From Swiss-Prot:
It comes from Pseudomonas fluorescens (strain Pf0-1). Belongs to the methyltransferase superfamily. RNA methyltransferase RsmG family. S-adenosyl-L-methionine binds at residues 81, 86, 132-133, 147. The gene is rsmG. GO terms for molecular function: rRNA (guanine-N7-)-methyltransferase activity. The lineage of its organism: Bacteria, Pseudomonadati, Pseudomonadota, Gammaproteobacteria, Pseudomonadales. This is Ribosomal RNA small subunit methyltransferase G. It is found in: Cytoplasm.
């Protein structure tokens, strides 16, 4: 198990991104590896992610985040319960013309995210330390995304005030959450759903895209 970023990690990222159809620039590749280095370093002292082995982080964090990038459009994005920064940090790196907000209620995690912003010079990234229910932005977001955050019922109920009829809600899930879809609030509908294949990851991955009906 490596304690730092290696050439193997760099190659795995390049190959995996190509497999996903994501064309990384040299700068984006470098920034993603810089983010990985910070994640490995800080995870030794803070519990940023349950994935302790750095050799698993490229597939389970970076490539998993990149797998949804083709569904992203430029705009104002919110990553709810961002934790260690997935998928918000990769989103900010791949979409430099978008404004990305990473929100988490855990102070250790938002301190890490702030350090990532400073060290990688991600001027399009905002880090907010708050409970999602208490967060009151000046205007609605174009997109709200979560990865392993909560049930879809909670995700939509807790973020309803952060979007409007034009907002897309993206829920990154493992096994298809058919039971959670049944429990969606009445003013939300499933817009589309997509099975994802993430290089190096075992198990199912799904992306569900929701919209408000009112």
């Amino acid at each position: 198990m490596s304690s730092k970023v290696t050439s193997q990690h760099a190659e795995e990222l390049s190959t995996g991104a190509r497999t996903l159809g994501v064309n990384l620039t040299g700068t984006q590749h470098e920034l993603l590896l810089g983010y990985l280095a910070l994640l490995i370093k800080w995870n030794q002292a803070y519990n940023l992610t349950a994935v302790r082995d750095p050799d698993e982080m490229v597939s389970r964090h970076l490539l998993d985040s990149l797998s949804v990038m083709s569904f992203i459009e430029n705009g104002r994005w919110l990553d709810v319960g961002s934790g260690g920064g997935m998928p918000g940090i990769p989103l900010a790196i791949l979409y430099p013309d978008s404004q990305v907000t990473c929100l988490d209620s855990n102070g250790k995690k938002t301190r890490f995210l702030t350090q990532v912003k400073l060290e990688l010079k991600l001027d399009n990234l905002q880090v907010i330390h708050s409970r999602v229910e208490a967060f009151q932005p000046a205007q609605p977001f174009n997109g709200i995304i979560s990865r392993a955050f909560s049930s879809m019922e909670n995700f939509t109920n807790w973020t309803r005030h952060l979007g409007d009829a034009d907002t897309r809600w993206l829920a990154m899930k493992g096994v298809h959450p058919a039971d959670e879809l049944v429990a969606l609030p009445a003013d939300f509908k499933l817009d589309s759903e997509h099975a994802l294949a993430v290089p190096g990851c075992q198990g199912q991955r799904h992306l569900l895209i929701l919209r408000r009906t009112a």
